């Protein structure tokens, strides 16, 4: 910030430390958003599992299924939730870096430095990473539902959920 100014607006001097911190904070934001999303999926899947498996005997249902699901998520499955969110955050971060590079190269084209093959290749990479991100999101959400039911770790749950999806292709 500029010292000695009496304005409501301040300027920031972007040195390398500030740039690295901004990248670090952005990655943390991606990780936290994915973690909260997967925590929500897990809690809803636990509540549905409580209801489904105690349908015949309502006395077996917990009084507060959301609180119990949150407790199970924190106590038993926090690492699995964090690992899946980290995996998704890394993929999203790579996608945003590629999108930044595409934008930078297109700005260079406006200045007269043309490289259409590079832009095409980078856009193909962004498309590939976006498709991979959607696949990981889908398999992870099904894996977290399986995790809520079976209680296994993240990788095992995703593998079993994927096997279940592949063995029943008409259902999804």
Question: Could you say what each language-model-derived stretch is?
Answer:
Residues 1-172:
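Hydrophobic alpha-helical membrane segments
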